[in-house]
């Protein structure tokens, strides 16, 4: 959408949350060479056999990087943090995707958009995502979320 601002590029390394609990370097990961976190991320790859299930899904790079940063003190709250020289930006900077409605919500902070096609997921899951997106677009975000909560028996936030 726009060039990465100089104040972001000035960090040794930077990336962003895809949601409050997970840092996704697939959105963006900029770094200087030999930044102190990189060996730990690479080591995380060497120790894993990808394809394993984690929380009902296939483990991926998000799990590796979030784990390394968590060991460095990352708080999974979606707020800006500096962990071992890595600036982690809130979701609206590099991932303005709303997973609940399958739509985009840009802000004045938004630098880029990652299109989640979820091509690695089973066909049934991809169809589910498309149905959610269509329902949210048809009903409107607020009505869709209210209906979803009512069906699940959740209280309104």
Features from the language model and the residues they span:
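Glycosyltransferase-associated regions of secretory-pathway enzymes
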Residues: 2-157
